[in-house]
């Protein structure tokens, strides 16, 4: 969970709280956090814990997601792909701070494609887009990947490919 060296940021501790400075010693983020950790393998994304609530900052101290969640995890392999957030329910927040999916789902998988996400709601898996349209409701047990209009699904222990329209 080391901070990336090439990001020119250092973790500092003052009076039992953590913050960030750059290599010149300039403060990037005040020492007011219980902890600051990286998202494993994701650059420019630091999880902050403030009084038991998690948030996310970039490597120059800009707040991307305020400290108001129980859990935050990356959606994909790059920070630009967004983050899954959780309190009582799950949702998705984009890097630009916009809400991609309202936090109303029982689960959001770390699989998405072409603006669509795999979610569980009321015990059933489905695919939704950012405008709230639902696809393939109750048509699968699991989704392995989404590639444009094609979805690799698992149903009754068997794998197959469906289009987003159900063909």
Language-model features: where?
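Residue-level detector of conserved, function-critical positions
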Residues: 1-167
């Amino acid at each position: 969970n080391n901070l990336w060296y090439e990001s020119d940021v250092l973790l500092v501790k003052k009076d039992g709280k953590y913050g960030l400075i750059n290599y010149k010693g300039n403060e990037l983020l005040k020492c007011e956090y219980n902890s600051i950790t990286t998202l494993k393998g994701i650059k420019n994304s630091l999880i902050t814990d403030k009084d038991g609530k998690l948030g996310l900052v970039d490597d120059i101290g800009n707040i991307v997601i305020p400290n108001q969640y129980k859990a935050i995890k990356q959606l994909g392999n790059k920070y630009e792909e967004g983050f899954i957030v959780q309190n009582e329910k799950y949702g998705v927040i984009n890097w630009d701070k916009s809400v991609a999916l309202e936090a109303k789902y029982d689960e959001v998988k770390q699989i998405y494609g072409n603006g669509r996400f795999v979610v569980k709601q009321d015990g059933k898996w489905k695919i939704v887009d950012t405008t709230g349209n639902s696809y393939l409701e109750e048509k699968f047990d699991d989704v392995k990947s989404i590639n444009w209009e094609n979805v690799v699904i698992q149903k009754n222990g068997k794998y197959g490919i469906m289009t987003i329209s159900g063909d």
